[in-house]
Amino acid sequence: QYNIQGMEKEREAMLQETQGMLYGMQYEIQSMQKRITAMEEKIIPALRKTFDATFLVYQENKIQLPAVIDAWEAQTMMQMNVLDEKLKLYEMIVDYEKELYR
């Protein structure tokens, strides 16, 4: 009798722990999605505008080529960061679903 109750309590505790972990993972996924969206909708367009403006100034022979390369590099690095973040997001979603259906 006590053994069965103990096992039931242990099972309940494990379920609560798993549920808490899943809620935590859900929150992480949502916050990462928001961060990626902000990067795609705000940061990358701003870097693209900076690059375009820098390139125009370069075409007018007012700045040197390294400034244009720096602006291009900043934009490209941010695009790479977004791709890295998306990879992490997709891996997190896979882990979440594995845990959910375990």
Give residue spans per PLM region.
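Amphipathic alpha-helical coiled-coil segments
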Residues: 2-81, 88-99
